[in-house]
Regions:
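Histidine- and acidic-residue-rich, metal-dependent catalytic cores
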Residues: 1-204
């Protein structure tokens, strides 16, 4: 490497395709012979490749990716199932480090919790918008039923004041319908995300 400033970081890039069981490349290194930074990058690179291939837009079903990675953390001839944190680093190795994979699990759980918080914020927005649009709809009904023009103008003005950008008398009802549908979807996603966390916590190798 010509740039001496980058040499301290070269090991990660050079050896991140090595595997703990010696089946990797370019040198077929095993276990402790593989720089620790390269072992970390190996796990991160595999996770990124799987997630990119599956085009995840949410953490729902992310546990399926982690299950695939568990296979690479398990020795080919090891059939006994034990908890991830009980697997000895001195035991016959799979391709990737169970210890590092466990750290990835924790990161994925934290990322999933962050997604949950973002969805909850959006749900709060949807609920507020639905409440406002329902009030508009009630004003519309009162306007239609009003017998005096003054009353009709009063409710019409109230509707105009409650409209937000892009909303009008012609489209607010469709927007309300779409918000209600979106709320159902997001509330289900919250349940699915919490379920993903439960699944990840139960994964064993």
């Amino acid at each position: 490497m010509k740039d001496l400033r980058l040499r301290p970081y070269a090991e990660g890039a050079l050896y991140h395709h090595e595997a703990l069981n010696g089946t990797g490349y370019p040198q077929g290194l095993k276990k402790e012979d593989i720089p620790f930074v390269a072992r970390i990058i190996r796990v991160a690179d595999e996770y990124d490749a799987l997630v990119t291939k599956r085009h995840y837009k949410t953490h729902v079903n992310i546990s399926e990716t982690l299950k695939l990675m568990l296979k690479d953390a398990k020795p080919d001839d090891m059939h006994k199932v034990v908890a991830l944190d009980q697997l000895s680093e001195n035991a016959q190795s799979g391709k990737i480090s169970p210890k590092i994979l466990k750290c990835l699990f924790k990161i994925v759980i934290e990322d999933t919790k962050y997604e949950i918080s973002c969805v909850i914020d959006y749900i709060d927005y949807l609920k507020e918008s639905i409440k406002r649009l329902e009030l508009i709809d009630s004003y519309n009904m009162k306007m239609q039923n009003a017998t005096k023009q003054k009353k009709r103008d009063y409710y019409k003005e109230g509707m105009v004041m409650l409209f937000q950008a892009g909303e009008n008398f012609q489209n607010y009802h469709q927007i309300l319908k779409e918000y209600r549908a979106a709320l159902v979807i997001r509330e289900k996603r919250i349940d699915d995300l919490y379920n993903e966390i439960k699944i990840i916590k139960k994964l064993k190798v």
